[in-house]
Amino acid sequence: MEQRVAITGIGAVSPLGNTALATWAAMCAGTCGIGPITHFDTDAFAVKVAAEVKGFDGNEYFGKHDAKHLDPCVQFAMAASDEAMHDAGFDVEGAIDRERLGVYVGSGVGGMQTLVDNVHTIADRGPRRASPYMIAMMIPNMASGNIAIRHKAKGPTLPVVTACATSAHAVGEAFRAIKHGYADAIVAGGAEAAIIPDAVAGFTSCRALTTNPDPATACRPFDADRDGFVMGEGACVLVLEGMEHAQARGAHIYAEVVGYGNTDDAYHITSPDPDAAGIARAISLAVAEGDVKPSEGLYINAHGTSTKLNDSSETAGIKRALGEDAARAAHVSSTKSMTGHMIGATGAIEVMACAMALEQGVVPPTINYHTPDPACDLDYTPNRAVRADLTWALSTNLGFGGHNAAIALRRYARS
């Protein structure tokens, strides 16, 4: 028998705050989390700004001994998972059968800082000086591995790696596993910590990043003057749980996950398909599985990267999937205008925004939106959050390699 699936825990470490609720409050306030890059000297770089996590001290959180054996990417993931598990009430002994608790937490690039540090060490001091922890700190599955160890989660584990769609696919696959009875609950999400010279240089070379040095206007999704995305970092983790399991223990339910679409453009390694067939099909699959009725109040948290190709293609995909009238009636926004592009964490934090929007009836804005683009002609909730009577939400994400994901949610009706 298929199970309904609830979101019962949320956790985040983001450029807007080091907890989920702080992040959500900042989104609703239209706060910009972008600023000058402080992680390294940018004098030789065309890119000057990023959305950095602020005030998170791994040494303080984990202790110096443990922190030095955890890449920042994994530190973010573990901190977010701690918050989500506590929020769900699963940090208490006996709260859940640990053999029925899974972990689906991925990363787009994994422990890149660890890899780069060790490459320099090997080049300067020889191969014998490589850290014995190098491999375990850099491989992308170790966010899931460390979270499973920390929370004694012995159920299904599936670290997902699909670039910018990573944590959307993680949430979607967790939804499927619970729906079909493979777990009672799954910790799902993603993390990234790639604001380092090597990653910024690489993204700059493929012309993905904005070179606008003004933090207040650098990221402007769907605006006619957009010219690239802003790198972000952090983590977001959600606890997905079978509805009956959650209701039986009296858990707080933020929203219900009802549908999931997973497709590929099969078009280009970095560029989205201009005809938007792939993302449109992902949306259509999620809408069909969830029996979504857009006319009843729909919020779409769009991928909205602030690149010329993505934003126009995604707009076309939304209209292709929903039809012109339903697409124009929907509330749309890109919270990347505030968080930057958190790569492997971005899908989960945007699903979190959808869940909170449904629960509170608030649509977070797309900030820095000033000049309309004829190719992007939907209601993008410009610059200020709005109140709305919402029943449904969609979160869409696209990743290098042509990966597309769409997650459909429904407002939870409390009796």
Could you say what each language-model-derived stretch is?
Residues M1-D66, E244-E256, M352-T366, R410-S415:
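ACP-dependent fatty acid/polyketide chain-elongation machinery
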Residues R4-T8, T31-G35, D214-G290, L298-Y299, ...:
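Condensing-enzyme catalytic core mediating Claisen C-C bond formation in acyl metabolism
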Residues I7, A20-T23, C28-A163, A191-V200, ...:
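Conserved beta-ketoacyl condensing-enzyme motif
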Residues L21-A26, M112-P127, A177-H180, V200-P213, ...:
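A glycine- and small-aliphatic-rich helix-loop capping segment at beta-alpha/alpha-beta transitions
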Residues A77-F90, P140-S144, A148-E192, V230-A251, ...:
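Active-site-proximal alpha-helical scaffold in enzymes
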Residues A84-D97, A246-I253, I283-Y299, A321-A326:
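Phosphate/pyrophosphate-binding loops at sites that engage ATP/ADP/AMP, CoA/4′-phosphopantetheine
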Residues D124-S131, H169-G172, R176, E192-A248, ...:
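Glycine-/small-residue-rich "gating" segment that lines the acyl/pantetheine channel
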Residues Y182-D227, Y260-P274, G304-D311, R328-D379:
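Acyl-CoA/ACP chain-elongation machinery
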